[in-house]
Amino acid sequence: MTNIDVISDMLTRIRNSLLIKARKVNVINTKLTVNIAEILKKEGFIDSFELADATCLTENGVIKKYITIFLKYKGPKQVSYITKIKRVSKPGLRTYSSYKRLQSVAGGVGLTVLSTSKGLMTDRLARSNKIGGEILFYIW
């Protein structure tokens, strides 16, 4: 059975959809991807998301459920609110940081998403709660 990195898959799907200025993108439904979508919506990077009824039967007979993420654009030229997404901690090389060493992204415009003992949270929330964790990705 193939093991995929759902975070990298999600970020790549969003990145590719932004390149073609798509309005929505389907991402594999896991607790982790739903929590990431909630953070992105709360911080204003995406418009909304919903649990899709669509399922897909893979070659192995596994049923995959998806969530639909609605991307957010501004102006008549349809400029995305997301400029760049950078994956930091990968399955082959995990990256951890204490709350004291967390740096602001893009001069405070962007954010860092962390996996902590209290769940997923942004760098600002981690600093205020004095919790460190695994740095999943940067977004600005």
Curated annotation (Swiss-Prot):
Instruction: Answer whether the UniProt record assigns the keyword rRNA processing to this protein.
Output: no
Membrane-spanning ranges? none
Query: Could you tell me the keywords of this UniProt record?
Result: Chloroplast, Plastid, Ribonucleoprotein, Ribosomal protein, RNA-binding, rRNA-binding
Gene3D superfamilies, from UniProt?
3.30.1370.30, 3.30.1490.10
Its biological purpose? One of the primary rRNA binding proteins, it binds directly to 16S rRNA central domain where it helps coordinate assembly of the platform of the 30S subunit.
What the entry lists under HAMAP family is as follows:
Ribosomal_uS8_B
Q: Which family does it belong to?
A: Belongs to the universal ribosomal protein uS8 family.
Q: What is this protein called?
A: Small ribosomal subunit protein uS8c
Query: Source species, please?
Result: Euglena gracilis
Tell me the lineage of the source organism: Eukaryota, Discoba, Euglenozoa, Euglenida, Spirocuta
Q: Which gene encodes it?
A: rps8
